[in-house]
């Protein structure tokens, strides 16, 4: 039989989370962000759950082609724009909208010969200092684009650096409003964190919102708030089984480096999951895990193919017992991916994207 580890994607939960995002901004259209292969879930696996989106936002042409191949005829936005001039031809052929964030991209458009004018989102660097034109240069970039016959419509967008934290977004909203005042076109500034935390503000919702991590059941502001606090459902479950049981005595150690020492008699289960499956190696003793739907903890260091769990809360568990590394157990109990990520010093986004190719994936509602 195959190794018992399995990832399960839940399209119904994806759909629920999309509707949750829409409730946060009922008067705006929603971009479903499916970059990085839908945050590791697989674009094709989540597509049915996202059909109700108003558009799909992603990073590259290959992802755009996959969405079109699924039958989507609505808007698709390239969040980083094109990476070289020849990409513009495929944008025309596929009917893609694309961000413009630098002078070179404007130059490429000016030299592009096309019968199909492009719809673009002009990106502002309102303080994150990643991509986009500074507020001081934004209007001149807009004027250059507006003069091009290759450009049909210009929308305005920016990205928040601190929507999930105490610094907030007011300073960036102000910079964006000042620089775009009186410019025509649609606006898009809210990401998942802004949508959930600041979506009640009409100055944030605007015409479009970008729903990213919120679609995949992770809280953008964990641990301040949990996914359940935002009514988000887990969209990925990583589960395995116990393949070995050991009975420890006081003084026995577990795993590489002997990082855990038993203080007395202790039953542990050995689970078929390790860092080669995408489980974070930095998750030390105490990381939450579910065995037969009962919450317990990991023991010792995570190795390439295995990890150990404390069986004290589930004394009847033995070979073949269900182990939920994150997501929803068979009995309905939920272990948020954010809690596991926090124990490993990272974020839920990274765990989703890091699921290893050797892990089988199924789709199940």
Curated annotation (Swiss-Prot):
Gene Ontology cellular-component annotations: cytosol
Chain positions with N6-(pyridoxal phosphate)lysine modification: 35
Biological or metabolic pathway of the protein: Amino-acid biosynthesis; D-alanine biosynthesis; D-alanine from L-alanine: step 1/1
Record-linked Gene3D superfamilies: Alanine racemase, Lyase, Ornithine Decarboxylase, Chain A, domain 1
Cofactor(s) this protein requires: pyridoxal 5'-phosphate
Reactions catalysed, as given in the entry: L-alanine = D-alanine
Gene Ontology molecular functions: alanine racemase activity; pyridoxal phosphate binding
Residues annotated as catalytic: 35 (proton acceptor), 256 (proton acceptor)
Keyword annotations from UniProtKB, A to Z: Isomerase, Pyridoxal phosphate
UniProt record, GO biological process: D-alanine biosynthetic process
UniProt EC number: 5.1.1.1
InterPro entries named among the record's database cross-references: Ala_racemase, Ala_racemase/Decarboxylase_C, Ala_racemase_C, Ala_racemase_N, Ala_racemase_pyridoxalP-BS, PLP-binding_barrel
Signal peptide feature range: none
Family note: Belongs to the alanine racemase family.
HAMAP family documented for this protein: Ala_racemase
Protein function: Catalyzes the interconversion of L-alanine and D-alanine. May also act on other amino acids.
PANTHER family (UniProt xref): ALANINE RACEMASE (PTHR30511), ALANINE RACEMASE, CATABOLIC-RELATED (PTHR30511:SF0)
Name of the protein described by the UniProt record: Alanine racemase
